[in-house]
Design a protein with these regions (language model features):
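Intrinsically disordered or compositionally simple regulatory linkers and C-terminal tails
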Residues: 218-230
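Hydrophobic transmembrane alpha-helices and their immediate junctions
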Residues: 70-107, 137-166
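Internal/C-terminal transmembrane anchor helices
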Residues: 233-239
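Interfacial juxtamembrane loops and adjacent helix segments
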Residues: 1-66
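Hydrophobic cores of alpha-helical transmembrane segments in multi-pass inner/ER membrane proteins
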Residues: 133-146, 195-217
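Membrane helix-loop boundary segments at the extracytoplasmic
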Residues: 61-68, 100-133, 169-196
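Internal, charge-rich low-complexity segments
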Residues: 82-134, 151, 206-221
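Polyanion-binding and phosphate-handling cores
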Residues: 48-93, 165, 169, 181, ...
Length: 239
C-alpha cells in the first residue's frame, strides 16, 4: 500500500545520499536513526501523525541493504538460497552437475534481474528490495517447473523415500512462504526463530540425521548379539 511505498522511498533517498554506507549499512537495528532525516512528510497524512520514523521498511531485502549493507544482503540471500538449493538436491531434483549448475544460475540471476529491472524503470531503489524477493521466488518456481516438465520419471534406485520427500517438501514450502511474507511484512522474533529452527530440521532430515529407518537396525542388532552367548550355553553338554 501507500505507506510501504513512502517508507521505501525514504530508504531509497537515504541510500542515495550516503553511498559510503553501502558496503556495511547503518548498522543492525539502527535504521530508525539513519532513516529519520529522510522521512516522507506525506506519510503523516495516511499513517499515525505522531510517527516520525520507522525502524522497519516492510521489506526484508531493503532492510538488509540499509542496515547491513551490500555485504550483509549478499550473505543473507546466500544463506536462504543455499537452503533452497539443498532442498532441491535432497528431493532428487538436482542430482547431477548440469541440474545443479542450472539451479545455481537461476538463483543468482533471479535477484539480480529483480533488482535491476525496478532500478532501470523507476530510477531509484524503492522497489529494488521487492524486486529481489520476487526475483528469487520466480527463479525457484521457474526452475522447479522446468525440471518437472523435462525430467523423466525416476527409477526405483533414484527415488527418494516417500516419508523423507514429504517432510522436505513441506518444510521447503514453509520456508518459501515465510520468505514471500517478509517481502511486504516485518519478520518478528517469533517468525525468525521459526524459520531457522525449521531450516535446521530440514537439514537434519536431508542429511539423514532424523532417518528412523536407518537407526532401527542398529537398535535391533544389540539384543541379537547379546543372545548369542546364551544360546551357546544352552546347547553345551554337561561334563
Amino acid at each position: 500500500n501507500q505507506v510501504r511505498i513512502y517508507v521505501w522511498e525514504g530508504l531509497s533517498d537515504m541510500l542515495a545520499a550516503h553511498p559510503e554506507r553501502w558496503p556495511l549499512g547503518v548498522g543492525p537495528d539502527a535504521l530508525y536513526l539513519g532513516y529519520y532525516p529522510y522521512f516522507v512528510p506525506a506519510l503523516r497524512q495516511i499513517d499515525n501523525p505522531l510517527v516520525g520514523a520507522h525502524d522497519r521498511s516492510h521489506n526484508e531485502p531493503l532492510d538488509r541493504l540499509a542496515t547491513t549493507g551490500v555485504l550483509g544482503l549478499i550473505a543473507w540471500l546466500a544463506a536462504v538460497e543455499v537452503l533452497f538449493f539443498y532442498a532441491a538436491r535432497w528431493l532428487g531434483l538436482a542430482d547431477d552437475r548440469a541440474r545443479r549448475n542450472s539451479l545455481i544460475a537461476f538463483l543468482v540471476a533471479g535477484p539480480l534481474v529483480g533488482a535491476l529491472v525496478p532500478l532501470a524503470v523507476d530510477r531509484s531503489l524503492r522497489f529494488a528490495g521487492l524486486g529481489i524477493g520476487i526475483g528469487v521466488t520466480l527463479a525457484l518456481i521457474a526452475w522447479l517447473a522446468w525440471q518437472g516438465l523435462r525430467r523423466p520419471a525416476p527409477t526405483a534406485a533414484d527415488r527418494v523415500p516417500a516419508d523423507r520427500a514429504a517432510v522436505i517438501t513441506a518444510l521447503l514450502g514453509v520456508l518459501a512462504a515465510h520468505f514471500v511474507e517478509i517481502q511486504v511484512g516485518i519478520p518478528v522474533t517469533a517468525t525468525q526463530v521459526m524459520f531457522w529452527a525449521l531450516a535446521g530440521v530440514m537439514v537434519s532430515v536431508g542429511v539423514g540425521r532424523l532417518d528412523a529407518d536407518e537407526a532401527a537396525p542398529a537398535v535391533e542388532a544389540a539384543p541379537t548379539q547379546a543372545a548369542a552367548p546364551a544360546s551357546k550355553e544352552r546347547g553345551a553338554k554337561p561334563l
